[in-house]
Amino acid sequence: MNVAILLAAGKGERLGEKVPKQFLEVEGRMLFEYPLKALLDSNVIDAVVIVVSRDWMDRVVEKVKHEKILGIVEGGKTRSQSVRNALKFLENIKPSYVLVHDAARPFLRKKHIEEVLKKAQETGAATLALKNSDTLIRLDDSRIEYVPREGIYRVQTPQAFSYDLLKRAHSEEKEWADDTEPVHRLGVKISVVEGDLFCFKVTFKSDLELARLIAKEWERIA
């Protein structure tokens, strides 16, 4: 069984909106509904768990009804806590693989779901990532240091792992930037699937403006 975990419990404070970004309405749908649709429509995903904050539980339960939705789980104060809550919810089910995706990345392609999951099934762990094409600098007290960009990737989601591996990686109450980091610390190689610019994370107002433009054509582009 392959289960997707959709993380939608963040506050999105950097965006400066009263409503968490994943629940902002764009072209008639809340942002989290875009990746949710891709996950529900995917032939390789058997079930979906949505992780949301307590304040939004009732509204999400009322809004999303689908036979593939396994449960709506209360999120933690951090991303890592939210993932651990979802993994705990799945303890009795023990799926073979889990695919984790950030709801703040609304434009998820079904082909990326399939490719990341397939690679994880082959190697145990995989992530979507975008090869960097920009010049990189490190700024320290107005001093600029140029960082070689060769081999530099921007890590995206979805990320997929065997359930047992991700559960073991999150066995300690630690905080991580994503889910590949604790898995990598176990000595497991992370396979990389080439992503694209559409799978960006809505963080700032300019990201939201871009999302509004893409949403108008997403059904055609996706």
Swiss-Prot record:
Q: From what superkingdom does this record's organism come?
A: Bacteria
Q: For the site Positions MEP for the nucleophilic attack, which positions are given?
A: 149, 201
GO MF annotations for this entry?
2-C-methyl-D-erythritol 4-phosphate cytidylyltransferase activity
Catalytic activity, per the record? Answer: 2-C-methyl-D-erythritol 4-phosphate + CTP + H(+) = 4-CDP-2-C-methyl-D-erythritol + diphosphate
Cited InterPro entries: IspD, IspD/TarI, ISPD_synthase_CS, Nucleotide-diphossugar_trans
Give site residues, Transition state stabilizer: 14, 21
Q: Can you supply one Gene Ontology CC term for this chain's record?
A: cytosol
* Entry EC no(s): 2.7.7.60
Q: Keyword check for Nucleotidyltransferase, yes or no.
A: yes
Instruction: Identify the Gene3D superfamilies for this entry.
Output: Spore Coat Polysaccharide Biosynthesis Protein SpsA, Chain A (3.90.550.10)
Q: Which HAMAP family match?
A: IspD (MF_00108)
* Record family assignment: Belongs to the IspD/TarI cytidylyltransferase family. IspD subfamily.
| Protein name according to UniProt | 2-C-methyl-D-erythritol 4-phosphate cytidylyltransferase
Q: From what organism does this protein derive?
A: Thermotoga neapolitana (strain ATCC 49049 / DSM 4359 / NBRC 107923 / NS-E)
Name the lineage.
Bacteria, Thermotogati, Thermotogota, Thermotogae, Thermotogales
- Name of the coding gene: ispD
